[in-house]
Curated annotation (Swiss-Prot):
InterPro entries: COG7. It is found in: Golgi apparatus membrane. It is a peripheral membrane protein. It comes from Rattus norvegicus (Rat). One of its GO terms (cellular component) is Golgi transport complex. The keyword Transport applies. It holds the Pfam family COG7. Transmembrane segments: none annotated. The gene is Cog7. Keywords: Golgi apparatus, Membrane, Protein transport, Transport. Required for normal Golgi function. Coiled coil: none annotated. This is Conserved oligomeric Golgi complex subunit 7.
Amino acid sequence: MDFSKFLADDFDVKDWINAAFRAGPKDGAAGKADGHAATLVMKLQLFIQEVNHAVEETSLQALQNMPKVLRDVEALKQEASFLKEQMILVKEDIKKFEQDTSQSMQVLVEIDQVKSRMQLAAESLQEADKWSTLSADIEETFKTQDIAVISAKLTGMQSSLMMLVDTPDYSEKCVHLEALKNRLEALASPQIVAAFTSQSVDQSKVFVKVFTEIDRMPQLLAYYYKCHKVQLLATWQELCQRDLPLDRQLTGLYHALLGAWHTQTQWATQVFKNPYEVVTVLLIQTLGALVPSLPMCLSEAVERAGPELELTRLLEFYDTTAHFAKGLEMALLPHLQDHNLVKVVELVDAVYGPYKPYQLKYGDLEESNLLIQISAVPLEHGEVIDCVQELSQSVHKLFGLASAAVDRCAKFTNGLGTCGLLTALKSLFTKYVSHFTNALQSIRKKCKLDDIPPNSLFQEDWTAFQNSVRIIATCGELLRQCGDFEQQLANRILSTAGKYLSDSYSPRSLAGFQDSILTDKKSPAKNPWQEYNYLQKDNPAEYANLMEILYTLKEKGSSNHNLLSVSRTALTRLNQQAHQLAFDSVFLRIKQQLLLVSRMDSWNTAGIGETLTDDLPAFSLTPLEYISNIGQYIMSLPLNLEPFVTQEDSALELALHAGKLPFPPEQGEELPELDNMADNWLGSIARATMQTYCDGILQIPAVTPHSTKQLATDIDYLINVMDALGLQPSRTLQNIATLLKAKPEEYRQVSKGLPRRLAATVATMRGVNY
């Protein structure tokens, strides 16, 4: 029987009984089941007895073992107490040992200090004795003129002197030693010059060793610089004495300097520890010692060139210098990590330094240059057609000048002159717009658009309008190219000067600007030839403006900017003037006829028809000649305005959409013509005609009854013309026609709802009561 299930945590009596019966006999006789149950009960009783017996035995054993455990615990307690006492004793022994050791170490330290002082005193005595010995022998040594031996003696004296710092006559000994070094240098100088001049590696190495030992290396390098500088300066003197242009002289000088760089670096690598720095300093000193100096030569050459060519000449010289700088950069680049970058920066400044004054005033130079060139572009000619042709051709010339200026800025200032460039471009466009405006005024005078002869015959002449359309197309080309140029300018500025903008730059405060400068200074070393920046130090205000421009272009995108907003606005005004010119050239003939309306004597003079009858029907009257001419002229407008519709000219379309015509539609008026430029112009001319006609009618002093009917007939004719063209007659013209047609006795009733001032004026003109 398995009794282990009684120990399980999830023991269930019912489950156990069911399982026990399932394990019994399979046949279900009642007697068999009772027998099986009795057997189970008996087995359980036996198991209980065994468990009770086992528990009793275990309890007895535990009670017997208890005294032994207590005795063991007591013994362990006594042993722990003894161990504690022993540890206290050991701790006291250790403490005593530490105290004894500390005292011993202190004694040893003091003994060592005494020993060190005694050794130092002994060495000092030895060095003092050595100094005395060497001082006594030095004169004899100098008589030998053996530089190596003299150098060894001086080195020994120098070592001795280092041990005699605290002696009373230390300063006197220093002066004496320096005097001896000077004697050695004077003695060796002819040999040094000979060694450097002949490029003797072995001899030069000896002198490098000697002068290094006596701490006179800078003086030795001075001899080296002087020897080779003399040769290079002589080359420059020879070039200057020849009758050569400055760019040729510069080419010769730079060729000599670059050759010296290559030969001297090869030689100096065998002699000096820092050969590249030595040769770099040689070039720096040579460029600074040129006679005549490069700044003076540049100044004289630019002055000889005159205002027209000064910037061109300057760029020619700069190209030569930039070519030399590129050659040096390529020579330095493979060994850039071996260079003293501070000296390389000085070399870059020495190469580009002569151009710095001109770079700082680049904006003024560029402005003067552009104004001279744009002044040479002819815009006015004797004939109108030639003038129009020149205006059209001037667009390409204008943006050619502007693009050339951008190229010069990138080449001469590496983008740092952007602020000056923008100012120069603004002046260029201002000057051009002024010339263009003067040309338009000249065309107006030649077309006689401002002074209309009072009695001139009415004749159609569309030449002025056709020329005006060409001028409008020119304005459109100006606007289009201005937009393209502005985009190219923004991209060019970012590509050339964008490298100067630090990622940490913030335009919100000057502190942010300063932080960005400091950040740049702490950044890893870059190529000084590519990082040359004359503007940041010499004109920080302009540099700050440049950073603002670059930041704006970078943040807002090069397509969202206002670099040439002033110039763009000026060109838009120019387009507006061209629109006015074209409008006036069309409207001139109409205006000429309408100005006669108020001055016609027939309005208040009784004619033959006046005496016949006032009851003749209105259709018996015909429009007068002035209004017939106007009507026929307006009817011919669609044909002559057709180029606006049929001509595929993107520049013309751009200009027409950018321009605004006079006499815009009244508020609330339907504007179907806005979708078509020709209809737009036709509507503007029609509104101008009706308004001018109304103004002329209202200036008539008085009209007779017959003239009233005639005037109403003329107005009806013009209204019919407008209807025929699909144009809406103006309210004022319709109101005047209504008031003129009203019978005198019905005038007051008819005028109700019409403008009172208009009704009163017409009533006075007709002589009716109102």
